[in-house]
């Protein structure tokens, strides 16, 4: 799919939910009195579904906890909240699992018996993030 000369990873419209587009409100809140402009966290989370076909990683069954705040597709879409910003203004990254699924990260395989591994700090990494998969 290409929109405004931007290719969305070569996917076709049929790969997306909701007939090729994602939608979310411009305002969010708990009541008509307590509303604010939508924050980027919810938008980024929903676009994770639409562009990358990623599942929700928060608890959808009410019997577990999902991945919590450890990824954008979990509760991390609400991210850090300072006293001056609304929830979702500073979402967290995609989890390593999500990054692997979309091809943004190739994990370093760690076999049983490996004594140590070194990962570069995120700010020192190349365009591809570093992660490990332990077997």
Regions found by a protein language model. Give the residues of each.
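Extracellular hydrolytic enzyme modules, especially secreted metalloproteases
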Residues: 1-135
């Amino acid at each position: 799919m290409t929109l405004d000369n931007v290719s969305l990873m070569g996917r076709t419209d049929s790969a997306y939910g909701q007939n090729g587009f994602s939608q979310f409100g411009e305002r969010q809140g708990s009541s008509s009195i307590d509303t604010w402009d939508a924050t980027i966290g919810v938008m980024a989370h929903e676009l994770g579904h639409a562009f990358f076909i990623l599942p929700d990683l928060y608890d959808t069954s009410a019997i577990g906890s999902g991945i919590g705040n450890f990824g954008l597709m979990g509760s991390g879409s609400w991210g850090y909240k300072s006293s001056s910003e609304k929830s979702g203004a500073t979402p967290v990254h995609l989890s390593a699992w999500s990054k692997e699924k979309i091809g943004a990260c190739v994990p370093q395989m760690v076999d049983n018996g490996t004594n140590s591994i070194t990962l570069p700090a995120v700010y020192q990494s190349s365009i591809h993030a570093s992660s490990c998969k332990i077997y």
